[in-house]
Regions:
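Extended C-terminal subregions enriched in glycine
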Residues: 411, 460-462, 494, 503-560
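Bacterial N-terminal signal peptides that target proteins for export
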Residues: 1-11
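Bacterial N-terminal signal peptides
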Residues: 10-20
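Noncatalytic scaffold domains of N-terminal-nucleophile
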Residues: 25-48, 52, 60-221, 225-227, ...
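Short, well-structured alpha-helical segments that form the helix of a local strand-helix-strand
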Residues: 63-67, 154-165, 232-235, 299-316, ...
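Internal maturation/activation junctions in enzymes
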Residues: 292-420, 429, 550
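Short, small/polar residue-rich loop motifs at catalytic or cofactor-binding pockets
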Residues: 257, 399-402, 465-467
């Protein structure tokens, strides 16, 4: 690790709390240790909401629900009742489970409907109500509550309602994102603005409409969102403004319990969200990386960074081809997570130089044959089979505006939870105090030849994305609870964190604050593009450019583009919990005082 990176680490040690104090006795900080449970989230008040519930005797499930609802108040640009997501839980007794509350396409959604209304791409709908998918967050909360919550929803929603009614101080992230999206807000949600102006740092933001909606749901039940008065409001708004969602879509929505995907990396067990999100790609990456001795290379070694770049390019194609809603399309979750399949993909990793346009044209941009490994086939058997046709990838619109939080309680129950409305402020339209997602942009803009590709638009289909909440354990004990926003950067960022933690023995704080890289083939110069946060040595950057032939772009550390992990570490020997908030997004950790 070079000296420049060590100097950058100092940025993560300072936290400025500008939010109002929570109602209960909790401690909040950028980095915080506790043996009474802890919450790490993208906003100090959201973390405090979860810690407040822990202090009142609630468990990790209770605290997660309180944190989720609070984020919808303090991060209205990234969280909403009209949002969606995925959570993974590991109970103290070792049981793991997950809830998929991804949004889905409404009944009216189709390529024919797009064409009829003049849309050539799904991205063109992202700031229109046609870009909204049927939301899953309230249904997800309801499902999670049924699996072990000990507190009533009135208690769990109380911190969020208090923040919405009393108001809170606008932080730098809130202000900047509001300014970045001012044109959209002015056109689609002018009453969200502060007398027609963007919200400024230090101003007090209140949301009485959202407080009223939350109180209504807490008293009447979350079903009111899908079948009652809130559903009626949504239905009327969509009909008035030309959106596609109807009350019947809301009534038909269900959150789904899924078996989490399991992987293993150098002695650590990884439990991660599976279909239809980014977990299969994450496990595939780690299976490939397990073949390399990164610790011997060194953290700042250009060969290590080159290998990671090339692996990320390969697995992005597999994500595009094989990760989607299993109720609609052929998927290959088990195949992608198969270590034998990783051996096959390892044969395509270009060690000697950057991937070029010639490599891409020759087939490197195509997915591998992951479906062949779904039932446990070995590499030797596969290599004797006739060659299979690979699938091409399609590009998707995907935004970085998501949020993640992590929870561990005093009993050892752990929750990793990622939620989103896709783009910052979603469609830019808001109703009853919350913004409406624009998840339709995550579907392909044109149908696949077979008509049921993983990201083809189909009514009721859950949209694929890259979110990857995960829990890592060793010898039966939780070690880390991890996750991040960041769209296509989510899986690469989390893989880099795992390598920092396991191969380089970094602390959680060091791992979160270490500079990150991102790979894509969109450099425009015939070679792959490597985007890097500042902090790597100049010699390493020169070697990547001149020795390996990569196009390198440097972004100043810390950059929100690379996500914002909010994570928890459990001491390997003493079991003490340490929570770390993201340096890239003003995150914080909070814990009960008693």
């Amino acid at each position: 690790m070079n000296g420049r990176f060590k100097r950058l680490m100092g940025l993560g040690l300072i936290v400025v709390l500008t939010a109002a104090a929570p109602a209960s006795a909790v401690t909040v900080g950028k980095v915080l240790s506790s043996d009474k449970g802890i919450v790490a989230a993208a906003h100090p008040l959201a973390a405090a909401a979860g810690a407040e519930v822990l202090e009142a005797g609630g468990n990790a499930i209770d605290a997660a629900i309180a944190t989720s609802l609070a984020l919808g108040v303090v991060e209205p640009y990234a969280s909403s009742l009209f949002g969606e997501g995925y959570m993974v839980a590991r109970m103290a007794d070792g049981r793991t489970w997950s809830i998929d509350f991804r949004s889905c396409a409404p009944a009216m959604a189709s390529y024919e409907q797009m064409a009829q209304e003049g849309f050539k791409t799904t991205g063109e709908m992202k700031l229109k109500l046609q870009g909204a998918c049927v939301p899953g967050l309230p249904a997800g909360i309801r499902e999670v509550m049924s699996r072990g919550a000990t507190k009533p929803l009135t208690d769990l929603a109380a911190p969020a309602i208090r923040y919405a009614e009393d108001g809170f101080e606008v932080n730098q992230t809130f202000s900047q994102i509001c300014k970045d999206n001012f044109k959209t807000l002015s056109e689609n949600a002018p009453d969200f603005l502060n007398e027609g102006l963007a919200w400024e740092l230090g101003e007090t933001f209140k949301n009485p409409k959202l407080a009223a909606t939350l109180r209504r749901l807490a008293e009447k039940g979350l079903d009111d969102f899908y079948r009652g008065s809130v559903a009626d409001d949504i239905d009327a708004f969509m009909k008035e403004k030309g959106g596609w969602i109807r009350k019947e879509d809301l009534q038909a929505y269900r959150a789904v319990e899924r078996t989490p995907l399991q992987g293993r990396y150098k002695g650590y067990n990884i439990t991660v969200a599976g279909l239809p999100v980014g977990g299969p790609r994450l496990i595939e990456n780690m299976n490939l990386f397990e073949n390399f001795n990164f610790a011997a290379m060194g953290w700042d070694d250009p060969l290590r960074l080159h290998i990671m770049q090339e692996v990320f390019l390969l697995t992005a194609s597999d994500l595009s081809a094989y990760v989607g809603d299993p109720a609609f399309s052929r998927t290959a979750e088990r195949g992608m997570a198969n270590k034998e399949y990783a051996k096959l993909r390892l044969m395509s990793v270009k060690l000697g130089g950057a991937t070029t346009s010639e490599d891409w044209a020759a087939g490197k941009g195509r997915a591998g044959d992951a479906p062949a490994f779904e039932e446990g086939m070995g590499l030797s058997d596969y290599l004797t089979l006739p060659a299979a046709a690979a699938l091409p990838a399609q590009e998707q619109f995907e935004s970085a505006s998501t949020t993640h939080f992590s929870v561990v309680d005093r009993w050892g129950n752990a929750v990793a939870w990622t939620q989103t409305i896709s783009g910052f402020f979603g469609t830019g339209y808001w109703l009853d105090g919350f913004f409406l997602n624009n998840e339709m942009g995550n579907f392909w803009s044109r149908p696949s030849p077979e008509g049921n590709g993983v990201s083809d638009i189909q009514p009721g289909k859950r949209v694929r994305t890259t979110i990857s909440p995960m829990i890592v354990d060793r010898a039966g004990r939780v070690r880390w609870v991890l996750g991040t926003p960041g769209a296509g950067r989510i899986v690469p960022t989390l893989c880099q964190m795992l390598i920092d933690l396991i191969d380089f023995n970094m602390s959680l704080e060091e791992s979160i604050n270490s500079p990150k890289i991102m790979s894509s083939f969109n450099s425009g110069e015939g070679v792959s593009l490597m985007e890097m946060e500042s902090g790597y040595s100049e010699g390493t950057i020169r070697a990547l450019e001149q020795g390996f032939g990569h196009k390198v772009e440097i972004k100043k550390f810390p950059d929100l583009y690379f996500g914002g992990p909010n994570a928890i570490e459990r001491g390997l020997f003493d079991g003490r919990l340490t929570g770390v908030g993201s340096v890239r997004r003003g995150g914080a950790a909070a814990a009960p005082e008693n």
